[in-house]
Amino acid sequence: MLASTLLAIGLAWPTSASGLLPCQESSAPYCPPRSASPEEQRGILGEFIQAFYKDRNGTKALLNHVAEDYIQHNPDILSGRQNSLDVLGPFLSPNNVNYTIMNKGLDNSIAYIHYRMDLVGGGQPSAVVDVFRFDGTCIVEHWDVAQQRPANATNPIAMF
């Protein structure tokens, strides 16, 4: 379950970033923060999702989008960008996990992603929601919740 929890600290994105506006001109790195409109934040979030989950380039995504003093609310990882880099590196591989996005959004500088996470070769899938707080152009805070689907779930559509 630790692997599931560690994987849940980021966003998941197996397909295109449709629904989030692309930035017209990338000006990464986005930290330290600069002011940004909601549309710009959506574009920056789309770039983060593309780099971190589709391209599986956690180093690029975190260095370009996450503040050095990033506040991490996951109980298994300390705050700070470098701690996330150190912990997530081994897990960002299609050989370890598959993601399916169920829902996503961004409003008032808060972004969320609800996704299905399947560990390769391992048991029941988990439902995960990641929540990120932006300060302008920069991701500065993260929360997540994860729940593994019970093997004998009564409701076949529960969680997804």
Predicted regions and their residues:
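Fungal secretory targeting signals
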Residues: M1-G19
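C-terminal and inter-domain tail/linker signature
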Residues: W13-F160
